[in-house]
């Protein structure tokens, strides 16, 4: 189900009850005021209505412990919603940064990332280093409380994070949807779907219990 950019309170409540998980995709830059910064000259225009919807949806789904997967902007949204900050433009703010803003085609590897030992992404991949694509000019700067790193680019840019106290809350900076045919990338979506199914089973079992 793809959500429209505007939902009233009743519609939001219905969506939260209907859906067992949420995927937050890539897109426009997040308004810097949401992480306590003024807009720099390099920050692209934001979409206030999208920010409003997605931050509200995230906080409510987080309270309900719904599974959530964030891709690119989605990782950045999770981080800022939980109290972290962002680099507004890597080339200007991180000397020596890789060129993270690749051109088409996106279904190819442009750099490697190192997966943190003991994290679920490392367990999924079964190896320390994997290749990824890269299509972003912003990135996590200060990681939010409650999130732990899962992957790093060679230049020190955070590439993935998760919340260990949640059933499934992963943020991925690259775009695994273009690399789905590789197990370590397609498996991210499979784990998310499996977590949503687990949540659905719990809901059904709870509703079946008398009283």
Residue ranges and their predicted role:
Residues 27-30:
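Short glycine-rich anion-binding loops that position phosphate/pyrophosphate groups of nucleotides
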Residues 72:
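Conserved G/P- and acidic residue-centered "switch" motifs that form tight phosphate/ATP-binding loops
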Residues 32-49:
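Glycine/threonine-rich flexible loop motifs
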Residues 75-77:
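Hydrophobic, aromatic-enriched interface-forming segments
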